[in-house]
C-alpha cells in the first residue's frame, strides 16, 4: 500500500489501483486547477496486492472529508479477498463522503453484497464532464463540514433499484449546482475609496471555533485575504479592502475549507451616476411611457414607430432611389464611437422587427448596415447578441438578396459591353423589385402602373392623372381617382379581346387567323388590299432527322439567348405570326433581366382574370375579391413572419433564374460536375447553413471493408489520377423561373447560392477537431476556463 501527500486532515482522498494511476493523476490536476482545493489537502492512496488496510491508514480515511474510489478491474478483484473487503468496509464510511467513479467497469447488484451503503454513494462515470467531478467533491465536503442544508433531498436508504438511485442522485446534483446560490451579500455594490462593511449570510452553519476568512480576487491585482468576524452561526462581516472598479470574486474559507463563493462590484461615483441614469432613461420604457403604452410592449411600440415612419414616406416609397449608397471616399465613417450610431442599430438592439424591415428599404440602408459601433458590432450582430436571432437572419438574408439582384443584373447587362451607363440605367428599372416582391406585395402603385400599359382604352395620361389627385383637393378629385382605379381594374379583368397580361395569346385571339387584320382598309391602295392570300406554311417534317451532333458538343454548346417573357406561355405562342398589333406596348431600349418576374399583386390579377374568362366569376365579383385580397395583404404585411416568407420566395426565384441561365445552351438532362478525386484523405466541409446547428448530410462516404479476393493489380496512383480527371454527368430536372412558381419544389441547395460578400467577407474552413480518445467523451464548453489544459487519460481495460 502506498500513500502520497502530507499527513493531517485532507479534503480529498483518492483510492485507486495501479491500472487507474493515470486517472488518479488527472483528478489531482483537475482539482488543483480550480483553486477550490489546496495542493496539500489532496491525498492519493494506492491499494496494492491483497493486503488489508492497516489501523494507522484507516485513520487517514477517517480524517478525510471526501473519498473518491476509482472502480477499475484490478480494484474490484480485491473485493473478493475477505481481509481487504473488511478493511474497505471500515474505511469507506460514512457513506455521504464517498464518491464512486466507474473506470472500466459497470454497475451491478453484486456490489450491494460487498457494501451495504453502495447506493448511498455518489456515482460518477468516466464520460462525465469535469464539472460533475467538482460538484460531487464539493457536495461531499459541504455535508462533512456540517452544512446539511445545502440540499434538502433526503437519502433513501432502502432503495435497491439502480434507476431509482440514479434519479435521486440527479435531483441532489441539480439542487447543489453552486454554493454561490446559498449566499447573500449586503451590500453587493461598493464605492471605491470608501470603507465599507460587507455582511455575508450563509445557508450552512459556521463553526465559531474555526477561523473564518474572506478572499477578494480582483483580475488585475493579487488576491487579498481578510479576517472575517462571526456575527452569528450563519452570518459573517468583513471590512472590504480598497480595490479598483469592476467585478471582484470572493471566496469564504472556514479554516482551510472553502464553504462558499460569490462576487461584489466596485464602482466609482461617476459609474454609479451613469448606472442610475441608464436605468432611469431606458429608451424603450421612456417611449412606451411617452406614447402611453401600458403595459410596456415592444410589439406595440414597434408597430407605432413603423406606422409613424410610413406616414412621413411618400406613397410610392423611397425604394426607387435604391439602398446601395456606400461611402467610398471617407472610409472612417464606417467606424463610429457611439454604441448605436444609426436608427438601424437602435431598432436591431431593441428587437423592433417591423421598423428594421422598413429601414432596410430606405436609401443608404447598406451604408448604415456597414457601420460598426464603438464595440465593432454591426446591426445584425447586435440583434443576435441581444437574443433576436430571427431578426439577425432576416437582416442577413435581405442584404444578401439585394446584393444578388445587383450582381445578377450587372452580370446580365455587362456581357460584352464596357459602358457603365447601361448598367446604371438598368439598375433603376429593377431597383424596386425587392420592395414589391418582399415587403409591400399589395401596393397599388406597381399594380396600376402595370395595368395602365395593357388596357387599350385607357388614355396615355391615365396613370399620371391618378397620381396627381391629392387628398386636399375637393371631394370630386377623390371620386375621380377612385373611378379611374376601378375603371382600369374592370377593363383589365374583363379580358376578352384585350387579354392584358398574355400579350402573345391576345394577338392570336384578337386578330384571329387573318394576317392582315391590323392593316386599315382606307390607308392603302385597292391593289394592295386585294393581294392574294399568303401561302400556307409548309408542315414540319414528321420524320425525325438523325442526330449527328457529337455528345461533347451538346454539353458545351452555348446559346446566346435572352430570357423569354414569362407572361406568355411557350405553348400558346404562334411562331408564324409576326405581325404586331395596332397599339403595341411601349418597349424599353434597355433589357431588363427581371422584367418577366410577376409580383404577388400581378399574379393575383392574372388568376382573377382567368376565372372571369372561364365564367367562374363575373367582373364585379372579381373586383371585390381583388380588393379583399389587397386589404388582407396590407394586414399581413404588418407581420414580420409574412415578410420573411415573401423574402424567401424572392430569393428562391432569383436562384432558380440564375440556375436556368447557367444551364441555357446545354442539354436539359446533362450537367458537368466537378471531377471526383478518389482519396481517403480528402478534407471536406460539411454542408451546413449559418443558422443551423447540424450538417444536412454526411459528406464523407462510408468506409469499405477489404475482403479476400478484392485486391486490384493496378497502380493506386494511376487509378486515382484517372478518376480525378474524369467528368461525371447526371440527370437533372429543369428548373422553372419566375416568382409565379409558388407551388414548385423550391428545394435549392444552400451550397449553390452565392453568399453576399457584405455579411461575411470570407468563408474560412473550420479548424480540425482533435482526435477523440477511445471511450473518452469530448470535452465541451461547459468545462471551466482554467481546466482546459487537462484531458482525462484512457479508461483502463475491463477485467476478464
From Swiss-Prot:
Bias kind Polar residues: ranges: 749-759
Post-translational modification: Constitutively phosphorylated. Phosphorylated on tyrosine residues within the YXXM motifs by BTK and SYK. Isoform 1 and isoform 2 are phosphorylated on tyrosine residues, most likely within the YXXM motifs, via CD19 activation.
Gene Ontology BP terms: cellular response to insulin stimulus; positive regulation of phosphatidylinositol 3-kinase/protein kinase B signal transduction; regulation of inflammatory response; toll-like receptor 2 signaling pathway; toll-like receptor 4 signaling pathway; toll-like receptor 7 signaling pathway; toll-like receptor 9 signaling pathway; TOR signaling
UniProt modified residues of type Phosphotyrosine: 266, 423, 448, 463
Domain (DBB): residue spans on this chain: 185-321
Comp. bias (Pro residues): 767-777, 791-800
Record's subunit section: Homooligomer. Interacts (phosphorylated on tyrosine residues within YXXM motifs) with PIK3R1 (via SH2 domain); required for BCR- and TLR-mediated activation of phosphoinositide 3-kinase.
Record comment regarding domains: The DBB domain is required for dimerization.
Name of the protein: Phosphoinositide 3-kinase adapter protein 1
Amino acid at each position: 500500500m502506498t500513500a502520497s501527500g502530507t499527513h493531517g486532515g485532507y479534503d480529498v482522498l483518492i483510492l485507486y489501483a495501479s491500472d487507474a494511476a493515470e486517472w488518479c493523476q488527472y483528478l489531482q490536476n483537475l482539482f488543483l486547477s480550480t483553486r477550490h482545493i489546496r495542493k496539500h489537502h489532496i491525498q492519493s492512496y494506492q491499494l496494492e496486492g491483497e493486503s488489508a488496510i492497516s489501523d494507522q491508514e484507516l485513520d487517514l480515511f477517517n480524517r478525510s472529508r471526501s473519498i473518491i474510489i476509482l472502480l477499475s478491474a484490478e480494484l474490484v478483484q480485491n473485493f473478493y479477498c475477505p481481509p481487504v473487503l473488511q478493511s474497505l468496509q471500515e474505511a469507506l464510511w460514512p457513506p455521504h463522503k464517498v464518491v464512486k467513479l466507474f473506470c472500466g467497469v459497470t454497475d451491478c447488484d453484486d456490489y450491494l453484497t460487498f457494501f451495504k451503503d453502495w447506493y448511498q454513494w455518489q456515482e460518477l462515470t468516466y464520460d462525465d464532464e469535469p464539472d460533475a467531478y467538482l460538484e460531487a467533491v464539493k457536495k461531499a465536503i459541504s455535508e462533512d463540514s456540517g452544512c446539511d442544508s445545502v440540499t434538502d433531498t433526503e437519502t433513501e436508504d432502502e432503495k435497491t433499484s439502480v434507476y431509482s438511485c440514479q434519479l435521486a442522485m440527479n435531483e441532489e446534483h441539480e439542487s447543489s449546482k453552486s454554493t454561490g446560490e446559498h449566499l447573500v451579500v449586503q451590500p453587493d455594490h461598493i464605492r471605491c475609496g470608501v470603507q465599507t462593511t460587507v455582511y455575508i449570510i450563509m445557508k450552512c452553519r459556521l463553526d465559531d471555533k474555526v477561523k473564518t476568512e474572506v478572499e477578494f480576487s480582483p483580475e488585475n491585482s493579487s488576491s487579498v485575504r481578510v479576517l472575517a468576524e462571526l456575527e452569528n452561526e450563519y452570518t459573517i462581516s468583513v471590512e472590504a479592502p480598497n480595490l479598483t472598479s469592476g467585478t471582484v470574486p470572493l471566496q469564504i474559507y472556514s479554516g482551510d475549507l472553502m464553504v462558499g463563493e460569490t462576487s461584489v462590484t466596485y464602482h466609482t461615483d461617476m459609474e454609479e451616476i451613469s448606472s442610475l441614469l441608464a436605468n432611469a432613461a431606458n429608451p424603450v420604457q421612456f417611449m412606451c411611457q411617452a406614447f402611453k403604452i401600458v403595459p410596456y410592449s415592444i410589439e406595440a411600440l414597434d408597430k407605432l414607430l413603423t406606422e409613424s415612419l410610413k406616414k412621413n414616406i411618400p406613397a410610392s416609397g423611397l425604394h426607387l432611389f435604391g439602398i446601395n449608397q456606400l461611402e467610398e471616399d471617407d472610409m472612417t465613417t464606417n467606424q463610429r464611437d457611439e454604441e448605436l450610431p444609426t436608427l438601424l442599430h437602435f431598432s436591431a438592439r431593441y428587437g423592433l422587427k417591423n421598423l428594421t424591415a422598413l429601414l432596410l428599404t430606405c436609401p443608404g440602408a447598406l451604408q448604415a448596415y456597414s457601420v460598426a459601433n464603438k464595440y465593432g458590432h454591426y446591426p445584425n450582430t447586435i440583434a443576435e447578441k441581444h437574443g433576436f436571432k430571427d431578426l439577425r437572419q432576416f437582416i442577413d438574408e435581405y442584404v444578401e438578396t439585394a446584393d444578388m439582384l445587383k450582381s445578377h443584373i450587372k452580370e446580365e447587362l455587362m456581357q460584352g459591353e464596357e459602358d457603365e451607363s447601361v448598367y446604371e440605367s438598368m439598375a433603376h428599372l429593377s431597383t424596386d423589385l425587392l420592395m414589391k416582391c418582399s415587403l409591400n406585395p399589395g401596393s397599388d402603385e406597381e399594380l396600376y402602373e402595370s395595368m395602365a400599359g395593357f388596357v387599350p382604352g385607357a388614355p396615355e395620361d391615365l396613370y399620371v392623372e391618378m397620381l396627381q389627385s391629392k387628398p386636399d383637393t375637393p371631394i370630386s378629385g377623390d371620386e375621380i381617382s377612385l373611378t379611374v382605379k376601378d375603371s382600369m381594374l374592370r377593363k383589365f379583368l374583363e379580358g376578352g379581346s384585350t387579354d392584358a397580361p398574355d400579350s402573345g395569346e391576345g394577338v392570336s385571339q384578337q386578330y384571329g387567323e387573318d394576317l392582315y387584320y391590323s392593316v386599315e382598309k382606307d390607308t392603302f391602295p385597292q391593289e394592295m388590299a386585294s393581294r392574294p392570300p399568303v401561302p400556307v406554311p409548309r408542315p414540319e417534317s414528321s420524320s425525325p432527322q438523325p442526330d449527328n451532333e457529337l455528345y461533347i458538343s451538346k454539353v458545351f454548346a452555348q446559346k446566346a439567348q435572352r430570357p423569354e417573357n414569362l407572361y406568355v406561355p411557350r405553348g400558346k405562342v404562334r411562331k408564324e405570326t409576326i405581325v404586331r398589333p395596332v397599339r403595341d406596348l411601349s418597349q424599353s431600349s434597355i433589357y431588363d433581366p427581371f422584367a418577366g418576374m410577376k409580383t404577388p399583386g400581378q399574379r393575383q390579377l392574372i388568376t382573377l382574370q382567368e376565372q372571369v374568362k372561364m365564367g367562374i366569376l363575373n367582373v364585379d365579383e372579381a373586383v371585390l375579391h381583388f380588393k379583399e385580397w389587397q386589404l388582407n395583404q396590407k394586414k399581413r404585411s404588418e407581420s414580420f413572419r409574412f415578410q420573411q416568407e415573401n423574402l424567401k420566395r424572392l430569393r428562391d426565384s432569383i436562384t432558380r433564374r440564375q440556375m436556368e441561365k447557367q444551364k441555357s445552351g446545354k442539354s436539359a438532362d446533362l450537367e458537368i460536375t466537378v471531377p471526383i478525386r478518389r482519396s481517403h484523405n480528402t478534407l471536406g466541409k460539411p454542408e451546413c447553413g449559418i443558422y443551423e446547428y447540424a450538417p444536412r448530410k454526411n459528406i464523407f462516404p462510408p468506409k469499405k471493408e477489404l475482403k479476400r479476393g478484392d485486391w486490384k493489380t493496378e497502380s493506386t496512383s494511376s487509378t486515382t489520377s484517372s478518376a480525378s480527371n474524369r467528368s461525371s454527368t447526371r440527370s437533372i430536372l429543369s428548373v422553372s423561373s419566375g416568382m409565379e412558381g409558388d407551388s414548385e419544389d423550391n428545394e435549392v441547395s444552400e451550397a449553390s447560392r452565392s453568399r453576399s460578400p457584405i455579411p461575411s467577407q470570407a468563408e474560412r474552413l473550420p479548424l480540425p477537431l482533435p482526435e477523440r480518445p477511445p471511450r473518452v467523451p469530448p470535452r465541451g464548453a461547459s468545462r471551466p476556463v482554467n481546466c482546459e489544459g487537462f484531458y482525462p487519460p484512457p479508461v483502463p481495460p475491463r477485467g476478464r
